[in-house]
Amino acid sequence: MGTEADRDGAMKQPGLGLRLAVLSRGPRLYSTRRIVEEAKKRGVDVEVCDPMKFSLVVNQGSVDVLHRGRAFAKDAVIPRIGHSITQHGVAVLRHIEQLGVWTANTGQGILQSRDKLNASQILARNRIPVPKTVYVRDILDVEHAIETVGGLP
C-alpha cells in the first residue's frame, strides 16, 4: 500500500475505512484539533461528537446509542471528557462500550484517574512508585499527616 502527498506535501495514508469519533465538547481545543488532523492525514473518517448530545437507549435485551438523534455507527472512540462532565461523559462512554466499540480509554479508567487517591492506591498496589500520601478529612489530623509525609514541600 503506497501513500500519496496531500496539498502541503505531507504523505497521506490511503483510506483505512475506520470510522472514529472523538468525544469532546470543544472541537476547537488544540488537543481535539490535533487528533482530528492526524486522523484525517491517515485517511480515517473522523467526527467530533459532543458527549452532551447523546441519547442512551436501554430496551429489553439491547442498548442503543444515538448522537443528535441518529444511530451512532463508529468503530472506535477517543474520549476527551472534561472534568465538569465526568459523570455524564462516562455514562455515554460505558454505553458505547456495551456496543463493543473500541475506546482509547474506558469509563472505568477515566473514573479511576479522576479519583487521585484511588489512582495512587492502584499504582501502589501494582508496585509503581508514588509519593507518600496521607488522606485526611478532619482538620485536626492535618498536622500529623504533614509529619507522616516528612513535612511540607
Ranges and model annotations:
Residues 10-25, 29-37, 46, 66-72, ...:
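Active-site nucleotide/adenylate-binding loops and adjacent lid/helix of ATP-dependent enzymes
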Residues 42-48:
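N-terminal ordered "arm"
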Residues 51-97, 104-113:
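N-terminal glycine-rich "phosphate-gripper" loop used for MgATP/nucleotide binding
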